[in-house]
Amino acid sequence: MRLGLKIASLAIVFLILGCLGGGETETGQKTAKLIIFHAGSLSVPFSQLESEFAKYAEKELGIKVTFQDEASGSVKAVRKVTDLGKKADIVAVADYTLIPQLMVPNYTDFYVLFATNEIVIAFTEKSKYADEMLKNPDKWYEILAREDVSFGFSDPNQDPCGYRSVMVMKLADLYYGKPIFETLVEKTTNIYANGTHIYAPKEIIVKDKRVVIRPKETDLVGLVESGSLDYFFIYKSVAEQHNLKYITLPNEINLKDFSKADFYKKVSITLGSTGKTIYAKPIVYGITVLKDAPNRELALEFLKFLLSEKGKEIFRENHQDFLTPPVAFGNVPEEIKGLVEIKE
């Protein structure tokens, strides 16, 4: 039995090595590089995941793996492949629907839903009215509207956290029965709404110096930490990872609660960057290995590692909930079929 397992393991290793297109070190060890484009909110868990996978690959597969790791807004991550023609092995996004919308069938034929999150409002003790925000979180929209308070969110055209943030503010209109979107978004930017449908022009213009927009949500972390920005809309996992103070929002607007999906989808947004319309829905992350991945077999090994108990543990340690089980769509590779629930 053990001999059979060893032979099977060796066969897998040789198969991977034969498909790598990598090189060798001076000592003859196989080397390979994985190119990963991922959402900024995945930076911390992916850094740890890559470190642990490198150890695993060297020990179990005999491969010294290096990473070309590029964090950006998820829309930008996808467009690096679809619009700029850049090569990548793996694309991981904060909104799984970007993969079937923009990448299937030309660039990939499967994807996996693997993690969740929620939108919160983060700040520090330096932020104006921080104590009041903590004591009266239901007044968040009143505090953000004050003339001496600055707040930010990421660019809806580049980053799901951005379009989710503005949809959260439109959902807040419905939940609180007050013109929160008009006050916080329409009066301060050129993003506008017709009823519950939002339009984000290709070039976002900020009309109020109190509002800051950056390409991805993690670009705003340093501004808040330094005290140059009071508040920003961010994923809970990122707020936790950076030890920021934050308030949670009602389940009706935080995009966390799957039982509220029918309420969420009342709001939608059309992005000027892609022309696509996106409906508000519970936050679910997605990942895929591309058809023409330079190191496809090794990329699938990385995906297996992410979906393993070790991968789930890394996400839990970084305050991000893992889907149980992860859900896969499309032409799901044999290598991961035992780790996911396959849906049509």
Swiss-Prot record:
Gene3D superfamilies: Periplasmic binding protein-like II. Keywords: Cell membrane, Membrane, Metal-binding, Molybdenum, Signal, Transport. GO terms for cellular component: plasma membrane. The keyword Cell membrane applies. GO terms for biological process: molybdate ion transport. Tungstate binds at residues 40-41, 74, 159-161, 217, 235. InterPro entries: ABC_trnspt_W-bd_WtpA (IPR022498), ModA/WtpA (IPR050682). Disulfide bonds: none annotated. It is a peripheral membrane protein. Residues 1-25 form the signal peptide. Molybdate binds at residues 40-41, 74, 159-161, 217, 235. It is found in: Cell membrane. One of its GO terms (molecular function) is tungstate binding. The keyword Metal-binding applies. NCBIfam families: PRK04168.1, tungstate_WtpA. The complex is composed of two ATP-binding proteins (WtpC), two transmembrane proteins (WtpB) and a solute-binding protein (WtpA). Belongs to the bacterial solute-binding protein 1 family. WtpA subfamily. Part of the ABC transporter complex WtpABC involved in molybdate/tungstate import. Binds tungstate and molybdate. This is Molybdate/tungstate-binding protein WtpA. It comes from Pyrococcus abyssi (strain GE5 / Orsay). The gene is wtpA.
